Regions:
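C-terminal structural segment of proteins
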Residues: 1-174
């Protein structure tokens, strides 16, 4: 998490922003949401709700928070190994694509940001890495570009390829 935080956007956001603010905003290219997915986070609110990260993020800039509801704390599972890799936009340092791989005792979760309109668990990679935590196990995996973002920074096909490439890099870094 500390190395992820070092690579966040600009100095103002890095030094004054909060993880709670980042996940409540749910910017599709923010870094912390990928960590929340991969680390199987539980988001605790002032209404005493405990929300699993996979249920918290709903869509672009959308979460399941209700009007007036605030994030009070976030609990993370501690993985056996983890790493975050991202392709940075050269101007903003936001993730064009970011991949957080976390290997837990119960299996592996691959959280992806920047690739689609909302952070998500790339289950095809998570399932294969849960069976065999090795970059070789995902080397032949094809990621579909069908729901990927496509803009001036990267095409949908490029983003799909980067999800796999960054996952391989993250696994190798573990």
């Amino acid at each position: 998490m500390s190395s992820l935080a070092e690579g966040i956007g600009d100095p103002q956001v890095r030094n004054r922003g909060t993880i709670g603010g980042s996940i409540a905003n749910n910017d599709p290219s923010a870094d912390y949401p990928a960590a929340c997915i991969a680390l199987n986070a539980t988001i605790n609110t002032n209404n005493n709700r405990k929300i699993n990260a996979e249920n918290f993020f709903r869509g672009m800039f959308e979460t399941c928070l209700k009007k007036g509801e605030l994030i009070e704390s976030i609990d993370f599972e501690i993985p056996q190994k983890s790493d975050y890799q991202k392709l940075k936009n050269p101007a903003s340092r936001y993730a064009v694509v970011g991949v957080y791989v976390a290997n837990h005792k119960s299996g592996t979760i691959v959280g992806v940001t920047g690739a689609k309109s909302c952070v998500y668990n790339e289950k095809s990679l998570s399932d294969k890495l849960s069976k065999n935590f090795s970059s070789n196990s995902i080397d032949s995996t094809e990621i579909s570009p069908s729901e990927m973002n496509s803009d001036i920074h990267a095409s949908a096909e490029y983003r799909a390829n980067m999800v796999k490439a960054l996952a391989i890099k993250a696994v190798d870094a573990c």
